[in-house]
Amino acid sequence: MIPDVKYARSGDVAIAYQEVGSGPRDIVFLRGVTGDLVSTWEQPLLVRHVEGLAQLGRVLMLDRRGTGLSDRVREVPSLEVTMDDIRAVTDHAGSDEAVIWTGQAATGVASLYAATYPERVAGLVLLDPRARGTSSPRNSAISFVKACKV
């Protein structure tokens, strides 16, 4: 059964989220840039993943600002704005402390959230974290090598 969608206010923007499961531990399942609440329930492997997490506690999943059922925005949100959105959702859900579970592109914002609010983070699970952005020196070096080939 697909859980009801709730909305938390982060400034002037409504952030859509769902709660799955219950238990003593809250888990914020933060998807990367792509993915939304609606498509989550259309992907059997992802549903199994969420249901597995829900056996451990209450899972909070959100649509990032400008995606899915959350309000549209004109600009790409910064890590700090996205962090504030996570805080708005956890506050609205009554979560004082949670494990943050995420991967790839969302690991930066999860790490920033944990560093900013250590008292609110019980744990940090980072799957396939990205240590470099697209403008990293490594990418510059690769571009240079490719440009030198004749």
Q: Locations of the language-model features?
A:
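Short, hydrophobic/aromatic-rich segments at coil-to-beta transitions
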Residues: 1-6
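Conserved HGGG/HGGXW glycine-rich cap/lid loop of the alpha/beta-hydrolase fold
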Residues: 7-71
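Short aromatic-enriched loop/helix-cap "lid" or pocket-rim segments at secondary-structure transitions
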Residues: 40-42, 73, 135-140
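Structural signature of beta-strand start/N-cap positions in the alpha/beta core
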Residues: 58, 97-99, 121-123
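Conserved acidic catalytic loop of the alpha/beta-hydrolase fold
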Residues: 80-98
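Short beta-strand immediately N-terminal to the catalytic nucleophile in serine-hydrolase-like folds
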Residues: 82, 100-103, 127
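Gly/Ala-rich beta-loop-alpha elbow adjacent to hydrolase catalytic centers
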Residues: 102-110
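Flexible "cap/lid" loop of the alpha/beta hydrolase fold
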Residues: 111, 115-116, 120-150
